[in-house]
From Swiss-Prot:
Component of the ribosome, a large ribonucleoprotein complex responsible for the synthesis of proteins in the cell. The small ribosomal subunit (SSU) binds messenger RNAs (mRNAs) and translates the encoded message by selecting cognate aminoacyl-transfer RNA (tRNA) molecules. The large subunit (LSU) contains the ribosomal catalytic site termed the peptidyl transferase center (PTC), which catalyzes the formation of peptide bonds, thereby polymerizing the amino acids delivered by tRNAs into a polypeptide chain. This is Large ribosomal subunit protein uL18. Keywords: Cytoplasm, Nucleus, Ribonucleoprotein, Ribosomal protein, RNA-binding, rRNA-binding. It comes from Suberites domuncula. It is found in: Cytoplasm; Nucleus. One of its GO terms (cellular component) is nucleus. Residues 264-283 have a biased composition (Basic residues). HAMAP family: Ribosomal_uL18_A. GO terms for biological process: ribosomal large subunit assembly; translation. GO terms for molecular function: 5S rRNA binding; structural constituent of ribosome. It comes from the Eukaryota. Residues 247-263 have a biased composition (Basic and acidic residues). The gene is RPL5.
Length: 293
């Protein structure tokens, strides 16, 4: 195809149509969104659920969302900043924390829907690929589709750790093991032991041991928060094992309690009641009459 220079004349600007705002901002892939949102026409009012996973510098966000005409609705959500409740106080954005957040989302959702006992998921974490199967007589498993947004879906990405946690928690997510840590492209096989190692933070503990031997100063600086919390390379796996058990025992969301003695500052005048307004009018009248005397 020959190169054609775009001539930006009057006709060009008259016919120009701007792209959607979120496309202009580089936030939404509308080609992917269309396929994740549009439901089969023979399913009528059945929502199409998707598991949305996003990463920030300090947090992991996992949500179950479905689309409506007026906008997307969030069914349930889980965040990595909730993990200190379950004993994971550091490393809230690593591979193991992503797995914990996905597991928390799944158990919270199924508890809210009354399916927690029927679909327990994978209780023995061995790193093998797992798929939720229909139990037969009872209700079908909750199905959601993975929404990674604009994340680059490379093998070993943390997005798939959160998805693995949600699947092991009991949510039916259509997937392939080809993007998990430990998958070998040449043999097309998943190395389950390596995936299990990452789920329990083994890669972090290996690096801790390496730094302790090679550079003590860098170890103290790099893992200062781990040292402060008393977490060692040997206690890492048990910390995540206990966290998984606590998440399964109580996945419910806890409201943040207000701090004692906290006084909120007002930057505007408080709204007066009717009684106060009438009293203010009386005072103004009295002050005006006093000036006339």
């Amino acid at each position: 195809m020959p190169f054609v220079k775009v001539i930006k004349n009057k006709a060009y600007f008259k016919r120009y149509q701007v792209k959607f705002r979120r496309r202009r901002e580089g936030k939404t892939d509308y080609r992917a969104r269309k396929r994740l949102v549009v439901q089969d026409k023979n399913k009528y009012n059945t929502p199409k659920y998707r598991i949305v996973i996003r990463f920030t510098n300090t947090d992991i966000i996992c949500q179950i969302i479905y689309a409506k005409i007026e906008g997307d609705k969030v069914l349930v959500s889980a965040y990595a900043h909730e993990l200190p409740r379950y004993g994971v106080k550091v490393g809230l954005t690593n591979y193991a924390a992503a797995y914990c957040t996905g597991l928390l989302l799944a158990r919270r959702l199924l508890t809210n829907l009354g399916l927690a006992d029927k679909y327990a998921g994978q209780t023995d974490i061995d790193g093998e690929d797992f798929n939720v199967e229909h139990m037969g007589d009872g209700p079908r498993p909750f199905r959601a589709f993975l929404d990674v947004g604009l994340t680059r879906t490379t093998t070993g990405n943390r997005v798939f750790a959160a998805m693995k946690g949600a699947v092991d928690g009991g949510i039916d997510i259509p997937h392939s093991p080809s993007r998990f840590v430990g998958y070998d492209e040449e043999s097309s096989q998943l190395e389950a032991d390596k995936l299990r190692q990452y789920i329990f933070g083994g890669h972090v503990s290996d690096y801790m041991k390496y730094l302790q031997e090679e550079d003590e100063e860098k170890y103290k600086a790099h893992f200062s928060r781990f040292i402060k919390e008393g977490i060692t390379a040997d206690s890492m796996e048990q910390m995540y094992r206990d966290a998984h058990a606590k998440i399964r025992a109580n996945p419910a969301h806890e409201k943040k309690q207000p701090r004692d003695g906290l006084v909120k500052k007002r930057w505007n005048r408080a709204k007066m009641s009717l009684k106060q307004k009438r009293d203010r009018v009386k005072q103004k009248k009295a002050a005006y009459l006093k000036t006339l005397e």
